[in-house]
């Protein structure tokens, strides 16, 4: 799926970003997002402009408000760059939440391709975690998906320790879970 960006205030930004299909032989090459300033190519190294967990996305961004001096130290101190980065993260979270709410079965089908981005974003960006906790999914051994809240409600009665804290059981290897 893709995200179209078109912002006029408080900064100018147009672009399109899309999530590539993740395969087992994942290509972790960054530099798949091209940055333009007034339709003139600037760089394909967008660290600092795009949140780190989203640099695996593909696409094109064009903004006259991004400085042509793209040194890392300059970008970290530029307020427009921080606003653009936060806006991109917000738009991605909004689009994912919209997909989850409007068509959950389709979202669940795409989850295996999206989960790498979402989980990495939740670990690296607190603001993204707050938004993504609503639509991040856990998969049980039967292949059914649950949100964090759904999983908590399902397991709260029988998966607590002696202090009453909920214990989450999780594995990435289904080979061993079938014997349990």
Predicted regions and their residues:
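Conserved GHKL (Bergerat-fold) ATPase module
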Residues: 1-178
């Amino acid at each position: 799926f893709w995200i179209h960006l078109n912002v006029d205030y408080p900064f100018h930004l147009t672009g399109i970003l899309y999530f590539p299909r993740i395969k087992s032989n994942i290509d972790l090459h960054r530099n798949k997002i091209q940055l333009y300033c007034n339709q003139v190519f600037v760089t394909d190294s967008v660290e600092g402009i795009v949140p780190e967990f989203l640099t695996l996305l593909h696409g094109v961004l064009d903004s006259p408000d991004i400085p042509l001096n793209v040194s890392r130290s300059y970008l970290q101190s530029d307020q427009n760059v921080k606003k653009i980065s936060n806006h991109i993260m917000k738009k991605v979270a909004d689009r994912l939440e919209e997909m989850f709410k409007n068509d959950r079965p389709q979202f669940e089908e795409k989850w295996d391709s999206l989960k790498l981005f979402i989980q990495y974003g939740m670990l690296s960006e607190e603001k993204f975690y707050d938004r993504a906790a609503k639509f991040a999914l856990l998969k049980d051994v039967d292949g059914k998906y649950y949100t964090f809240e759904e999983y908590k409600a399902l397991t709260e009665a029988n998966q607590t320790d002696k202090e009453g804290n909920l214990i989450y059981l999780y594995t990435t290897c289904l080979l061993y879970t079938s014997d349990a």
